[in-house]
Amino acid sequence: MAHKKSGGASRNGRDSNPKYLGVKRFEGQIVDAGNILVRQRGTKIYPGINVGLGRDFTLYALKPGIVKFSIKHGKKYVNVLPIQ
């Protein structure tokens, strides 16, 4: 009788935790200062008027207002326009 031990366990079976990236406040929504607008990896969207850029490229509102997205020179920007 052959005595061959069974093979090792599967090499798969790992997964990373979800990062919950993406746009969090959409165009036309009213935001307060400090609200997170976009979570991203790198600058897919750039900060515009009244928008700050965090250490992990998170875009957040610097002042209360209305969210507005725009494209300039092929780059996407997010702005927070003050409420009149």
From Swiss-Prot:
Q: Where is this region: Disordered?
A: 1-20
Which PROSITE patterns has this protein been placed in? RIBOSOMAL_L27
Alphabetic keyword roster: Ribonucleoprotein, Ribosomal protein
Question: What is one cellular component GO term in this UniProt entry?
Answer: cytosolic large ribosomal subunit
Coiled-coil segments, which residues? Answer: none
Any one GO MF term held by the record is: structural constituent of ribosome
Tell me a GO biological process for this protein.
Answer: translation
Please verify whether the record's keywords include Ribonucleoprotein: yes
Q: Which domain of life is it from?
A: Bacteria
For whether the record's keyword set contains Membrane, the answer is no
Q: Name one Pfam family in it.
A: Ribosomal_L27
Question: Which NCBIfam families would you find in this protein's record?
Answer: L27
UniProt family annotation: Belongs to the bacterial ribosomal protein bL27 family.
- Recorded protein name is Large ribosomal subunit protein bL27
Q: Which organism does this sequence originate in?
A: Dictyoglomus thermophilum (strain ATCC 35947 / DSM 3960 / H-6-12)
Gene that produces this protein: rpmA
